[in-house]
């Protein structure tokens, strides 16, 4: 009973009419299958004419296909191999051909790959001695260990975000230490002179205001006309070319209305 439970299921198929069990066991031994005595191969001949194998899905642990023609196994047969094999099971396609085999190897590798098998390997089987036929090469591939429709969680990539170092041991620069004594001193505001705080020039004026007022008196202008010049015609500040004959600002340089009239130091002095 225990030996039957441990017995592994192997399917051997061929496009030939006959396939001896001894040949199947010899090939499986050379392919590296362990405990060969526990194998009880199921043999199907003339498999190229079968549309579907009479086996349940995922019921076979290994498939051995022995082909004597270039068309076997077809894409449809390779799809059947994938259906009946358990996840992680292997398929081995052995060719009985002579002559150039490179193109046929590529064709079989493509077929098993399109059927969903992984890691196809090319095997040299010329060393296997059989009484009924001689092998030239083989292709071995593996069915994925996961089932179609199964899902698994993908690990999300870890994103390295910028990290701010808040180590209190780091020495910080005191902003006040960057200032000199001169920077810390309060600026001294200029002291207003006597003329700036009064409407008229002081008695001992040295800032030049007394001279300006004196020139204004000579022109017959009042202090208000000097400090805040106005014009009813709007042309008094443009210069003598635009002033009328009775303009009080006649003889003065151009100025802006509403701003203090500034007289030069040599104003009203005779030219030499």
Curated annotation (Swiss-Prot):
Motif (Cx2C motif 2): 244-247
Gene3D superfamilies found in the cross-reference section: Vaccinia Virus protein VP39
Keywords in alphabetical order: 2Fe-2S, 4Fe-4S, Cytoplasm, Iron, Iron-sulfur, Metal-binding, Mitochondrion
Cofactor(s) this protein cannot do without: [2Fe-2S] cluster; [4Fe-4S] cluster
UniProt comment concerning the protein's domains: The C-terminal domain binds 2 Fe-S clusters but is otherwise mostly in an intrinsically disordered conformation.
Role summary: Component of the cytosolic iron-sulfur (Fe-S) protein assembly (CIA) machinery. Required for the maturation of extramitochondrial Fe-S proteins. Part of an electron transfer chain functioning in an early step of cytosolic Fe-S biogenesis, facilitating the de novo assembly of a [4Fe-4S] cluster on the cytosolic Fe-S scaffold complex. Electrons are transferred from NADPH via FAD- and FMN-containing diflavin oxidoreductase TAH18/ATR3.
Protein's UniProt name: Anamorsin homolog
Region (Fe-S binding site B): 233-247
Similarity remark: Belongs to the anamorsin family.
């Amino acid at each position: 009973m225990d030996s039957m439970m441990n017995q592994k299921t192997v399917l051997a198929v061929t496009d030939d009419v006959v396939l001896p069990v001894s040949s199947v066991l010899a090939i499986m031994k050379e392919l590296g299958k362990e405990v060969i005595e526990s194998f009880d191969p199921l043999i199907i001949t003339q498999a190229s004419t079968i549309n579907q194998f009479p086996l349940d899905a995922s019921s076979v642990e290994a498939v051995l296909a022995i082909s004597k023609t270039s068309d076997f196994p077809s894409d449809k047969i390779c799809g059947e191999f994938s259906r009946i094999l358990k996840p992680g099971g292997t398929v081995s396609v052995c060719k009985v051909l002579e002559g150039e085999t490179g193109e046929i190897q590529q064709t079989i590798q493509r077929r098993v790959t399109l059927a969903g098998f992984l890691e196809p390997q090319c095997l040299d089987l010329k060393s296997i001695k059989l009484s009924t036929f001689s092998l030239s090469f083989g292709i071995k591939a593996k069915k994925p260990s996961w089932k179609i429709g199964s899902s698994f969680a993908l690990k999300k990539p870890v994103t390295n975000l910028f990290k701010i170092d808040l180590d209190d041991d780091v020495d910080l620069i005191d902003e006040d230490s960057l200032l000199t004594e001169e920077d810390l001193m309060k600026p001294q505001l200029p002291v207003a002179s006597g003329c700036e705080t009064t409407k008229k020039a002081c008695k001992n004026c040295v800032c030049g205001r007394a001279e300006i007022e004196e020139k204004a008196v000579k022109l017959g202008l009042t202090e208000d006309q000097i400090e805040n010049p106005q014009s009813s015609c709007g042309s008094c500040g443009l210069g003598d070319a635009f002033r009328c004959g009775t303009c009080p600002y006649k003889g003065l340089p151009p100025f802006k209305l509403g701003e203090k009239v500034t007289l030069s130091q040599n104003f009203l002095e005779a030219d030499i």
